[in-house]
C-alpha cells in the first residue's frame, strides 16, 4: 500500500486534506461539555400533600407509589424524601445507557396505577414526573438593589413572569423557586367565627361555591330554530379577582335578614402561596430559581440559552430589580476545556522540539509535525460520527494521542534516513525499502495499543462512559496515525527529504547538535556493553525483575483508591442546621453571620453569596439554611485561595458558631452525581427495627465517625427529630357531643394546615386561594381551644371538649432507599486520605452497628465501588488482548511473552510517581496506566520485531538482540521523550480541571520513564530468555557473548 502512495504523492495529499476538512467541519458541530453524560438516567416524581406530616406523606403517598414501581426495566435503585411541609420526591435511577424517554414512560405508566390509591388532596395538587439530575446547573436570582420590592414581591414576579419561559428553554429538566407566587390568603379569626356560629368548613364551602367560572352557553346556538337571526355568547359568573370581591362573599343570612360576609370573620389579601423559603443576595432582598439540567442535555448550550432568555426579559423588569447568577457551574466547563486546549498546543510545541533535537533535520521534523493536524482533525470527525462531544475526557485523550501519533511518523522518518545513510539509496527508493522493514511493526504497534484500550469501551456504568471517551478517542487517533504513516508520511519522505550520503545519518560534529550526538553515541556504546553484561548474567537480572513485580504488587495494595480527583469548580456550598424546632428568625441570624464572614474575611476569594433560609440539601424547614458561594475567577486566585482552602478556613470559623452546625463543602468533580465531594451512604432499616432504633444507629455511626482520623465532615443528610404535638381525638366523646370525625379533621386541616380552595385571576394569571387561621390563633397548643366545630344540633363545640394533646418527637424529613426506611450520611476523607480509604472506614463502622441495620452506597460512591470491582477484569482483558494480537502478528505463542513481560516495568513507575505526589488510584490513573502498558509494549515491539528478523536472517539470539537494541535505541528514546514532554503540561496545570490533569499526567509520565529506562535493558533479556526457553534454534555459526564486539560496544 505504501508503495502505491509513494509513487502517487498527490493522491496521498488529497486523502490528508479530505480528512482535515471533514474534521474541521465536525468541530463546528460538536457540542462542548465538561464531561459526557456520566450520571445514570434518573426520573423524579414530585408530589405535594398540603398540611401533611412527613410520616403521613411516607405512609399514604411514598409507599403506595414505590410498591408500583417494581418491575421497571433496568431500574438500579429508588430513593425518596418526605418532608413535614407535605412535599415529597421519589427518584428512580436507572442503569447507564437506558433511554431516559423510555424510562419516563414506564414510570408514568406505573404511576397511573398508583394515582387512584393516593389521597384526593394529592391528586388535586397534581403529580409531576420529570427527567432530572441531582444537582443544580445554575441559580437565576432577582435582587432589589434599592429595596423597593420585598422577597415575596420578587418571588411572585419570578413565578408569574419568568418561570414559564425559563421552563420552556431547551435543556431545562426541572427547577425550584426559592419563594412562591402570590395567592389570595384568607386569614380566619376563630373568635369571630364562633360569634357568628360559623366554622372553617363553612367558609371553605362558601368560597368554593361563589368563586367559580360558569360556562353559561349561547343564545341562538345550534341546533337553532328556523329563522334565527342572533347568535351571542352568554357571560356568566367569573372567578373573583380582588381581595374586596372575596371579602364580599356571603357566608350566612340570619333570620332578621342581616348578612355575614367573609370580611366579617377574616382578613383577606394577597400574600405568599407559602412562606417556607426566603432568600438574599449579598444581604439584599432577593428571590431565585434553581435550574436542573435535563438528562442528556448540554450544559453549556442550556446555560447560554437561559442567559439569552433572561436578557430578553430584563427590559420588562420593575425599576431597581436586577438579574444575577449567584451560582453557575458552566464557567468551569469553558475554563477547563480552554486549559486543555492550551495544554494541547504546548504538547505539540514540545514534541516538535524533541523531534528536531533527535532528527536534526528541519524537513524531517516538519514531516512528522504535519501528521499532527491530519490525525487530530480526523479524530474529531470520528468523534462526531460516534455521537461524542468535545469534553475534558476527549481532550485529555487528544493530549495523550499526540505523543502516540507522532511515534509512527518518527519511526518512518527515522528509518528512511537510516536506510539512506546505511545503504546510500535516494529518498524515494529508501522510503520503499524502509516501509518494507517497518510496516509490520507499525501495524503491530497499532494492534497492541488498540488491544490495550479497546476493552475499556465495553465496560458499563458511569466508569464505562469515562473509559469509552478515552478508548474511542485514542484508538481512533492511533488508527488514523497508522494510516497516515502508511499513506501520507512515506509520500512526504519520498518528496521532501534530501538525499544523504552513506554514513551521514546524525553526523553533525559542530555546535549543539555535535555535542548532543557525541554524548548520545557514547551513551549508545555504554548501553550496548550493559546489555551484553545483562545477557551474560541472566539470572540476577531476572531475579531483579521478580523484585520489581513484587514491589509493583505491594504498591498497588498500598496506594489509596478513589473514583475521580477533586476539582476546584469555582463554587462552594455552606449548609446551616440550627437546633431542632428553631424558628426561621433564629436560623436567619446564623445565616447572616455566615454571610458576613464570607463577604468580609474572604473578600479576596469570594465573589458573591446567595443565602436561602428554609432550605438546604439535607431538607426543608425553619431550622435549615443554605449558601451558594461563587468564587472569583481562577486567574484571580492563588493556590491558597482555592475552593478547598476556602472550605477548610470557613469550616474552622463555622466551628465557633455555638447555636448551629454549619458545613462548608465543595461540589464533586462530576456534578451530575451529587452535591458534595466525599462519600454518600444510606443506613437502612433492613430488619424492621423502627425509626427510633434507626436514629440511634445513625447517632452511633456519627459518634464513631467523629473519632476516626480517616473521616471528616461526616454529617446526616437529613434533619434531626424535632418537637411535634400529638393531637388525640376522643372518638366516643366526639360522637356523644354530636360532632363528626370528618368535620374535626377538615377543621384542623383548614385552620392549621392552610387548605387550598380553588383559583382566582390576578392580573391575567391563574393563582390559588388558601384558607388558614390567622397567626395568633395557631402559635401554641392552647390556641386549639379557640377553634370550634358545629355539632348536629347546631351548637358550637370547642376542641377542648373532645381533644387532648402531648409533646412528642418526630422527624421533619423521612428517607427511604430501595423500599426500606433509611438515613443518608455524607462525609469526606480527612486530609491525606482518599475516598477509597474513607469508604473502607465507613464499612468498618457500619459493620459494628446493631443487627437489623444495613447500608448501601449511592451516587458517586456507588460508581466508585463499581469501578473498583471492574479494574481487575479490565487489566486482565487488556493484557490478554495484547498477547493474542502479538501471537497473531508473529505467528508465535512464545514471542508475545517477551513483550507482555515488559508491562510491570511501566506500571511500577506509574505507581511510584502517583504515590510520591500523594495522588490516588482513580479512574484517570487507570486510564493513564493502560496507556503506559500500551506504550511499554510498543517499545518492546520495536526491539523484538527487529531482533526476530535479524535472528531469522542467521544472527544468534544474543547478536540479534544487541543489534536490535542498537538500531532502535534512538527512535525509542526520541518517541518516549516526545510523549513524556507532551504530557508534562498536564502535570503542571493549574486552575479549572487541574486535578484531573495531574491525575492522568503524573501516572503516565512516571510509567513512561520507568518503561523506557528499564525496558531497553530488560526487553533483550526477555527476548533471549523466552526464545531460548521455547527452543529457538541458533544458527550454525554462532556469535557468542564473548565476541569482542560486545566489549567494543559496536
UniProtKB/Swiss-Prot annotation:
It is a multi-pass membrane protein. Induction: The arpABC operon was not seen to be induced by carbenicillin, chloramphenicol, erythromycin nor by hexane, toluene or p-xylene. One of its GO terms (biological process) is response to antibiotic. It is found in: Cell inner membrane. GO terms for cellular component: plasma membrane. The chain crosses the membrane at residues 10-30, 339-359, 370-390, 393-413, 440-460, 472-492, 539-559, 871-891, 893-913, 923-943, 972-992, 1004-1024. Keywords: Antibiotic resistance, Cell inner membrane, Cell membrane, Membrane, Transmembrane, Transmembrane helix, Transport. Its main location: membrane. It comes from the Bacteria. The keyword Cell inner membrane applies. GO terms for molecular function: efflux transmembrane transporter activity; xenobiotic transmembrane transporter activity. Pfam families: ACR_tran. Belongs to the resistance-nodulation-cell division (RND) (TC 2.A.6) family. The inner membrane transporter component of an antibiotic efflux pump. Confers resistance to numerous structurally unrelated antibiotics such as carbenicillin, chloramphenicol, erythromycin, novobiocin, streptomycin and tetracycline. Is not involved in organic solvent efflux. This is Antibiotic efflux pump membrane transporter ArpB.
Amino acid at each position: 500500500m505504501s508503495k502505491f502512495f509513494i509513487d502517487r504523492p498527490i493522491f496521498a495529499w488529497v486523502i490528508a486534506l479530505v480528512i482535515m476538512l471533514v474534521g474541521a467541519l465536525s468541530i463546528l458541530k460538536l457540542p462542548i461539555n465538561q464531561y459526557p453524560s456520566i450520571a445514570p438516567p434518573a426520573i423524579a416524581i414530585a408530589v405535594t400533600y398540603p398540611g401533611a406530616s412527613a410520616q403521613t406523606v411516607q405512609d399514604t403517598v411514598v409507599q403506595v407509589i414505590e410498591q408500583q414501581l417494581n418491575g421497571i426495566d433496568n431500574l438500579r435503585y429508588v430513593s425518596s424524601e418526605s418532608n413535614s411541609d407535605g412535599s415529597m420526591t421519589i427518584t428512580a435511577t436507572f442503569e447507564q445507557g437506558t433511554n431516559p424517554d423510555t424510562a419516563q414512560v414506564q414510570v408514568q405508566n406505573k404511576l397511573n396505577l398508583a394515582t387512584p390509591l393516593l389521597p384526593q388532596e394529592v391528586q388535586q395538587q397534581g403529580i409531576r414526573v420529570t427527567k432530572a439530575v441531582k444537582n443544580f446547573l445554575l441559580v437565576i436570582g432577582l435582587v432589589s438593589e434599592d429595596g423597593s420590592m420585598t422577597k415575596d414581591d420578587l418571588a411572585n414576579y419570578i413565578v408569574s413572569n419568568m418561570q414559564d419561559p425559563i421552563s420552556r428553554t431547551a435543556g431545562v429538566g426541572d427547577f425550584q423557586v426559592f419563594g412562591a407566587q402570590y395567592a389570595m390568603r384568607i386569614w380566619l379569626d376563630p373568635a369571630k367565627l364562633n360569634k357568628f356560629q360559623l366554622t372553617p368548613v363553612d367558609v371553605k364551602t362558601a368560597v368554593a361555591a361563589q368563586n367559580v367560572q360558569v360556562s353559561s352557553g349561547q343564545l341562538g346556538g345550534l341546533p337553532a330554530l328556523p329563522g334565527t337571526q342572533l347568535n351571542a355568547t352568554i357571560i356568566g359568573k367569573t372567578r373573583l379577582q380582588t381581595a374586596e370581591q372575596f371579602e364580599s362573599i356571603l357566608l350566612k343570612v340570619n333570620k332578621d335578614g342581616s348578612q355575614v360576609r367573609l370580611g366579617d370573620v377574616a382578613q383577606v389579601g394577597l400574600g405568599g402561596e407559602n412562606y417556607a423559603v426566603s432568600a438574599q443576595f449579598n444581604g439584599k432582598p432577593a428571590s431565585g430559581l434553581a435550574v436542573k439540567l435535563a438528562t442528556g442535555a448540554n450544559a453549556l448550550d442550556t446555560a447560554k440559552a437561559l442567559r439569552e432568555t433572561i436578557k430578553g426579559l430584563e427590559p420588562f423588569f420593575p425599576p431597581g430589580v436586577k438579574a444575577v447568577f449567584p451560582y453557575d457551574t458552566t464557567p468551569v466547563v469553558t475554563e477547563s476545556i480552554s486549559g486543555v486546549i492550551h495544554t494541547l498546543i504546548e504538547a505539540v510545541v514540545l514534541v516538535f522540539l524533541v523531534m528536531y533535537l533527535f532528527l536534526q533535520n528541519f524537513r524531517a521534523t516538519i514531516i512528522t509535525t504535519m501528521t499532527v493536524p491530519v490525525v487530530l482533525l480526523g479524530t474529531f470527525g470520528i468523534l462526531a460520527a460516534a455521537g461524542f462531544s468535545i469534553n475534558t475526557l476527549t481532550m485529555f485523550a487528544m493530549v495523550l494521542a499526540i505523543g502516540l501519533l507522532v511515534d509512527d511518523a518518527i519511526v518512518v522518518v527515522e528509518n528512511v534516513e537510516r536506510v539512506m545513510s546505511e545503504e546510500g539509496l535516494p529518498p524515494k527508493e529508501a522510503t520503499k525499502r524502509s516501509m518494507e522493514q517497518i510496516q509490520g511493526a507499525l501495524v503491530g504497534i497499532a494492534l497492541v495499543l488498540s488491544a490495550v484500550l479497546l476493552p475499556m469501551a465495553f465496560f458499563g456504568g458511569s466508569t464505562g462512559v469515562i473509559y469509552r471517551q478515552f478508548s474511542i478517542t485514542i484508538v481512533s487517533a492511533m488508527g488514523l496515525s497508522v494510516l497516515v504513516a502508511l499513506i501520507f508520511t512515506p509520500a512526504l519522505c519520498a518528496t521532501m527529504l534530501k538525499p544523504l550520503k552513506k554514513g551521514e545519518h546524525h553526523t553533525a560534529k559542530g555546535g549543539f547538535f555535535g555535542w548532543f550526538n557525541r554524548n548520545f553515541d557514547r551513551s549508545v556504546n555504554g548501553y550496548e556493553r550493559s546489555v551484553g553484561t545483562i545477557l551474560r548474567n541472566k539470572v540476577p537480572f531476572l531475579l531483579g525483575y521478580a523484585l520489581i513485580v513484587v514491589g509493583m504488587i505491594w504498591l498497588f495494595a498500598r496506594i489509596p483508591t478513589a473514583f475521580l480527583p477533586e476539582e476546584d469548580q469555582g463554587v462552594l456550598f455552606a449548609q446551616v442546621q440550627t437546633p431542632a424546632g428553631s424558628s426561621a428568625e433564629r436560623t436567619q441570624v446564623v445565616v447572616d453571620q455566615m454571610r458576613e464572614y464570607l463577604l468580609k474575611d474572604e473578600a479576596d476569594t469570594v465573589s458573591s453569596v446567595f443565602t436561602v433560609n428554609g432550605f438546604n440539601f439535607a431538607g426543608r424547614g425553619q431550622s435549615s439554611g443554605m449558601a451558594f458561594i461563587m468564587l472569583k475567577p481562577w486567574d484571580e486566585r492563588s493556590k491558597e485561595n482555592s475552593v478547598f482552602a476556602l472550605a477548610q478556613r470557613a469550616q474552622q470559623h463555622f466551628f465557633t458558631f455555638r447555636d448551629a452546625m454549619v458545613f462548608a463543602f465543595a461540589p464533586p468533580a462530576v456534578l451530575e452525581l451529587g452535591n458534595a465531594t466525599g462519600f454518600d451512604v444510606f443506613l437502612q432499616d433492613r430488619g424492621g427495627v423502627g425509626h427510633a432504633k434507626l436514629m440511634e444507629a445513625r447517632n452511633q455511626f456519627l459518634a464513631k465517625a467523629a473519632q476516626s482520623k480517616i473521616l471528616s465532615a461526616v454529617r446526616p443528610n437529613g434533619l434531626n427529630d424535632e418537637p411535634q404535638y400529638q393531637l388525640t381525638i376522643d372518638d366516643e366523646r366526639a360522637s356523644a357531643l354530636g360532632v363528626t370525625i370528618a368535620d374535626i379533621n377538615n377543621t384542623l386541616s383548614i385552620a392549621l394546615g392552610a387548605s387550598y380552595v380553588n383559583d382566582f385571576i390576578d392580573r391575567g394569571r391563574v393563582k390559588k386561594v388558601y384558607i388558614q387561621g390567622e397567626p395568633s390563633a395557631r402559635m401554641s397548643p392552647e390556641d386549639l381551644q379557640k377553634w370550634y366545630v358545629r355539632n348536629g344540633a347546631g351548637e358550637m363545640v370547642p376542641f377542648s371538649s373532645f381533644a387532648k394533646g402531648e409533646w412528642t418527637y418526630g422527624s421533619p424529613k423521612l428517607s427511604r432507599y430501595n423500599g426500606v426506611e433509611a438515613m443518608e450520611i455524607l462525609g469526606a476523607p480527612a486530609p491525606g486520605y482518599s475516598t477509597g480509604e474513607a469508604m473502607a472506614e465507613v464499612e468498618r463502622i457500619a459493620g459494628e452497628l446493631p443487627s437489623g441495620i444495613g447500608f448501601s452506597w449511592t451516587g458517586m460512591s456507588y460508581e466508585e465501588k463499581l469501578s473498583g470491582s471492574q479494574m481487575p477484569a479490565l487489566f486482565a482483558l487488556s493484557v490478554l488482548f495484547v498477547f493474542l494480537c502479538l501471537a497473531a502478528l508473529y505467528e508465535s505463542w512464545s514471542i508475545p511473552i517477551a513483550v507482555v513481560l515488559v508491562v510491570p516495568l511501566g506500571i511500577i513507575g506509574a505507581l511510584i510517581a502517583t504515590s510520591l505526589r500523594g495522588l490516588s488510584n482513580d479512574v484517570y490513573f487507570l486510564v493513564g496506566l493502560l496507556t503506559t502498558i500500551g506504550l511499554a509494549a510498543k517499545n518492546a515491539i520495536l526491539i523484538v520485531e527487529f531482533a526476530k528478523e535479524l535472528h531469522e536472517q542467521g544472527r544468534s539470539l544474543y547478536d540479534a538482540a544487541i543489534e536490535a537494541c542498537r538500531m532502535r535505541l534512538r527512535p525509542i528514546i526520541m518517541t518516549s521523550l516526545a510523549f513524556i514532554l507532551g504530557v508534562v503540561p498536564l502535570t503542571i496545570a493549574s486552575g479549572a480541571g487541574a486535578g484531573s490533569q495531574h491525575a492522568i499526567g503524573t501516572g503516565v509520565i512516571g510509567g513512561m520513564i520507568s518503561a523506557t529506562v528499564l525496558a531497553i535493558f530488560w526487553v533483550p533479556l526477555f527476548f533471549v530468555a523466552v526464545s531460548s526457553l521455547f527452543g529457538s534454534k541458533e544458527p550454525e555459526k554462532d556469535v557468542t557473548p564473548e565476541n569482542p564486539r560486545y566489549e567494543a560496544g559496536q
